[in-house]
Amino acid sequence: MGDIGRREVLGNAGKLAIAAGIGTRLGGKGTRPGQVRTAAARRLQPDWAALASRLNGRLLRPGDRGFVTAGLPYNRRYAAVRPAGVALCADVADVQTALAWARHYGLPFTARSGGHSYGGYSASRGLVISLARMNSVQVDRDSLTITLGPGALNRDIYAGLAGTGVAAPSGRCPTVAISGLLLGGGFGFSSRHLGLTCDQLLETEVVTASGALLRVSPQSHSDLFWACQGGGGGNFGINTRFVLRATPVAGVSVYKLEWDWQHAAAVLGAVLDLMPTAPHSMSCRVGLDVTGGGPVAGGTPRRGVSALGLYFGSAAELTELLQPVLKAARPSDQLIEDRTFVQAAALLAREVPKGSFTSKSRYLDRPLPAAGIDTAIAWVERWPGSSNASGAGATLFAWGGKISERAPTAAAFVHRDAAFLMDNEATWLNRDSARVISANLDWAAGMYTALAQYGNGQAYQNFIDPALRDWEAAYYGQNLHRLMEVKRRYDPDDVFRFAQAIPPAS
């Protein structure tokens, strides 16, 4: 079960409720993912045997082998939200069957590909419609296309690209699936050069609330196609196939640099000065990282600074481009090497934090000034600590390049003109005390507020944050009204809904 077992889930129910901070949103009274409760449906008892008999895949119920793993969301902050069943779909017909069955009985449901929703929105107390087994990857070098099942993980995609000489921008975390990644935008170390994942979309298939299977492209259901390019997962239907544009690539180079904490201000300042004018073929993630203990959890904190990224060119050229950063302070650890695209992806890979976590993002139109850098450093030094080895920190991703070449309204993804995406994150384990958990949540919220003046009011919808106020404007900006119109057309009854789902236009 990862970091928690069944006893721990039960024993920590109170702490999980504190950590989730969502009251009854995911299964008590109030809004439920995919809930459609008619009076007739409430009188029906779900016929699980009937569902199992109609699936080409498999239905898992409590007590079945594999149920616990299949039912848990990746973010263990929401581990107390357990399904009544998990439909392991083998094909599109299974998706349609599971959806129709859940609607018939008025049972809460959610579709899950990788299960990495930061806000726990791929968890359900009813039926989880799992797309994990629909994970095919087909690369066609002749047509320069990549056809993906909705459950294809980043690691599956990179494995499929190995040796083909083509690439598509995908994410950093190996176990994130294409559905959530692409539907919320999707960025990675190749995005400044190749664009966002959603910008590569050529065609997708969508099962709508009515059970219809739509083939969606710029020529067919163009409004839904537009919405699938960054309008967020779980809003309009269940995507069951994606066709992406592939781009030929030769060798690339990669860098990973680390510094001792005393160099934090100098290094962060140098990176933030460099990237706005750096070639679009170069990417960067710079982080202020802390692990270990803290004043609340006890123990000794370990802090450091890291910068890493990809360059579509040689290591020699990359070394020259990095000179302003290398001269700002001497790294304690340095790697700058030529690699293949797939090798570089493996070297730069990092899992989303294990255990429980909170993440708060914002976009910046310009680099943090010196005062903002000092504020970020001071807050990292105040992290209260936890038992989670993933620790906490503040991260900035260089934006721009190919990402900014499309207009904010050309696709649903609106965040085109920013200079950086900033994310601050805190992690813990559910065995930590309620005091430690609350301190981490307060720390993340405090740091977010302290740096608010430097943001542009926007946030990344794939780093979905249940505590974010005005999330509609932050995630979707000027595209919100059009997204609501698309929702009204394809899901007028609001079947696909959760706490931060796009509502249909009235």
Write out the residue ranges for each language-model feature.
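Soluble FAD-dependent oxygen oxidases
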Residues: G2-S506
